[in-house]
Amino acid sequence: MAGNFDSEERSSWYWGRLSRQEAVALLQGQRHGVFLVRDSSTSPGDYVLSVSENSRVSHYIINSSGPRPPVPPSPAQPPPGVSPSRLRIGDQEFDSLPALLEFYKIHYLDTTTLIEPVSRSRQGSGVILRQEEAEYVRALFDFNGNDEEDLPFKKGDILRIRDKPEEQWWNAEDSEGKRGMIPVPYVEKYRPASASVSALIGGNQEGSHPQPLGGPEPGPYAQPSVNTPLPNLQNGPIYARVIQKRVPNAYDKTALALEVGELVKVTKINVSGQWEGECNGKRGHFPFTHVRLLDQQNPDEDFS
């Protein structure tokens, strides 16, 4: 389906200073190809293309080289000796944001093309948990964070969930009041023995009962076993089963295509969530959320 929008009408797709969480709140649940462009909060002068695709919200960094073009652009030409800005996304370069959007009207990003900008009537929406529904999780692994908006934590930390803008990334608060995004597969549900929130955060956690984040919740989530550490590649091969199809960007030759049910040999586990592995004789990187690690003690049980 070809995109149905005017790329020159910047007011329809450019949102300026907008956080990742706010972008997700606007795009979550929208049909594939709905998008917006915002300023990067971690790299001043750059942009981010946020897109609803494959039942999630993806964020693509757009790097700007040279003087950043104003939005909307000024009709004036750049002064002599000053090179116009170039915009880069992946391996592609463009002279302007409209040109970039026109390109992705007919070319896939990951699993979708750009169809239309998100409606501004969606602004301010989101799924925020009420205080009386406060939910807590406990960290299964250390997480150092990869983005300014991430919340670093250590194994065993107790975090309060503030909202769930994405399936695999939730917004949480730690015992010091710091807030940020956390990867869902790195935590487990935590049910406090005491109803006191103040006693829970930073208090004694004995007597609590952890629950895996999978269980009765719908959808194919990639969840590590409770209290089982990430496997050590030095102990031998690690295998995973694909639980979510992935059709990578045709221009990314290092990305690994995945079909549900396929077996992947994991060769490298990166904290960023982009793992590396082999599948059907090909090597490449893939999101850890698309696979489920097999029981390394009894892998043959899952090899069918």
UniProtKB/Swiss-Prot annotation:
Tell me which UniProt keywords the record has, alphabetically.
Acetylation, Cell membrane, Cytoplasm, Membrane, Phosphoprotein, Proto-oncogene, Repeat, SH2 domain, SH3 domain
Please verify whether the record's keywords include Transcription. Answer: no
| Phosphoserine: residues bearing it | S40, S41, S74, S83, S125
The protein, known as: Adapter molecule crk
* Entry annotated with the keyword Nuclease: no
Q: Which domain of life is it from?
A: Eukaryota
Give compartment(s).
Cytoplasm; Cell membrane
Q: What is the effect of changing W169L?
A: Abolishes interaction with DOCK5. Abolishes RAP1 activation
UniProt modification remark: Phosphorylated on Tyr-221 upon cell adhesion. Results in the negative regulation of the association with SH2- and SH3-binding partners, possibly by the formation of an intramolecular interaction of phosphorylated Tyr-221 with the SH2 domain. This leads finally to the down-regulation of the Crk signaling pathway. Isoform Crk-II: Phosphorylated by KIT. Proline isomerization at Pro-237 by PPIA acts as a switch between two conformations: an autoinhibitory conformation in the cis form, where the tandem SH3 domains interact intramolecularly, and an activated conformation in the trans form.
Q: Which residues carry this modification: N-acetylalanine?
A: A2
All copies of the SH3 domain together span 132-192, 235-296
What PROSITE patterns does the database record attribute to this sequence?
SH2 (PS50001), SH3 (PS50002)
GO CC terms, sorted: actin cytoskeleton; cytoplasm; cytosol; extracellular exosome; membrane; neuromuscular junction; nucleus; plasma membrane
SH2 domain boundaries: 13-118
Q: Which residues carry this modification: Phosphotyrosine?
A: Y108, Y221, Y239
Give the compositionally biased regions (Pro residues).
Answer: 67-82
Q: Which family does it belong to?
A: Belongs to the CRK family.
Disordered, as annotated region: 61-85, 201-229
| Domain-related comment | The C-terminal SH3 domain function as a negative modulator for transformation and the N-terminal SH3 domain appears to function as a positive regulator for transformation.
